[in-house]
Amino acid sequence: MGQDVRSPRGPRCIALVGPFQSGKTTLLEAILARTGAIPRAGSVDDGTSVGDATPEARHHKMTVGLTAATTSFMGDSYTFLDCPGSVEFAHDMRAALPAVDAAIVVCEADEKKLPQLQIILRELEELKIPRFLFLNKIDRANKRIRETLAMLQPASRVPLVLRQIPIWKGELIEGFVDLALERAFIYREHKASEVVALDGGNLDREKEARFSMLEKLADHDDALMEQLLEDIQPPRDAVFDDLARELREGLICPVLLGAASRENGVLRLMKALRHEAPGIAETAKRLGAPSAKDALGFVFKTLHSQHGGKLSLTRLLAGHLDDGATLQSASGGTSRISGILAVNGAYDTKRATADAGDTVALAKLDPIKTGDTVSSGKTAPAALAAAEPTPPVLAISVAATDRKDDVKLGQALMRLHEEDPSLVVVQNAQTHDTVLWGQGEMHLRVASERLRDRFGVKITSHPPAIGYQETIRKPIVQRGRHKKQSGGHGQFGDVVLDIQPLPRGEGFRFAEKVVGGAVPRNYIGAVEEGVVDGLARGPLGFPVTDVQVTLTDGSYHSVDSSDLAFRTAARIGLNEGLPQCQSVLLEPIHVVEIVCPTDATAKINAILSARRGQILGFDTRDGWSGWDCVRAMMPEAEIGELIVELRSATAGAGSFTRQFDHMAEVTGRAADQIIAAHQHAA
């Protein structure tokens, strides 16, 4: 059965993860209250919780960003990371997971949330993070525990091992039996559970359930298997050792019961963490951190406060760190620490030092960003694995309500991206708009609120412009002539342009076939610049593409000709020639790949068809039981709000990626409406 793995492992860091509204923040409050970190548990609904302390979280009554809080239990220090359950804010969870020793997956007996649970468990499995499953809201249970476990098991690749069974009183659960301890407890609201005699029907149920637990442990322990075959009861300490080892190695996912709102099951959960969760040495090994005397840390979250400046939430993987130390980053930055702060939800308590295992906030590490590996050594450390931001799926164009705030807006957007890399800011080269990309409606709404409340920038927003273009069907030869006489040197340029359509996707080509020096070679570049100017806005009001323009002839004046004159002449030639070329509107088409639970595939197909999507096919999602992957061609104009419908149809579990494929013609009434709307907006 191996050696005892339950020795103290230093300060530990535990992630609280789970589907949206499963009770993670309520569990954090219960943990902090039961361990004495706060006098009593706060409430999400009342806006008094430690976890949802930001104005945005309290306004929306949901976790919209990671919160870290530290407590102590039986002499050990624990930092809990309350991670958002909404898929729109999931990057905070992904960025933090490499730093944790273990995760508590908070869930409930709700089949609708099973796909969300599967996504979270898969993330933990791939990162090899030990995990407990806390079956919350057990006071509202309307299913027997075996039925619930059978429902949840498909979400996990490894066995869900029941550590406790409920004690029923009629149709209500009044306590539980700990299968490893072989003790029975009756819940007491907001108090420690009361130990009661294990007898009668509960004893029979305990023996059956305990044997089932031991059988699952024995799948990875030959000595235990032999004992079970010989009808020998294994020592209790040996069972705990097996639970700890198999948890650490990712062979099982223990399941514990409770009701966070009543603080039921919290102390047993803490004891399971204390006995079984790995410590910082195992976590550093899992991450591939090198052995060194220097301090080594992983930055998993960046925060900007109105008055406190930049804070980098950091897990110290090894070594000792003093305030004022200089840190080297794997990304190349160097910075001196301007303060070490304890993480207690508010980040306002100073510390002089930090040691391996501690989770702290480091002040004003300006070049250092989320996902960086930092070291107090003289050379930059090797980078440890960091989460890549999820590609954004929804965008808005933003502008400062007061133009005097334009620079301030740019700085604030940069800080928002630093805090949350899944928010992406781009400049539209065609419209020069600032476009803010995010993970959904709520994600963008909260970003707008933070711009206003934290950075003092009010914004206006609207849907971003679609990348429409236009092309031509008919060739033409057009002269462009610019002549201006205003005393002294005049302006003269004369060009003949052959304008030809190109196959779709060829873009723009320029050529010259001038003979006899009709247009001197030093003016050819100016002619091309004028052509580009003329193609920037065609007769329909959009950039022109898939066109070749050839300079074939022209004339010049030895005194009055100049680069400006020939550039102007070429632009005039385009502006006069293009309206005669039978312009046609083009819209961008993307390949969209959607992943969704199989039972939602029919709904997804209907949504795609209603949005002018051309379904290319679908297949089962590789390695994901009960999931499909649907591929389709879709106009960019129809993708804008796709994520809203997709999440509505999949209980928040569906997602998609997109890739530009080609430009396609738009004709008839649809084209007329697009052109009219564009001209009205201009």
Give the predicted meaning of each segment:
Residues 1-682:
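Structural and coupling elements of P-loop NTPases
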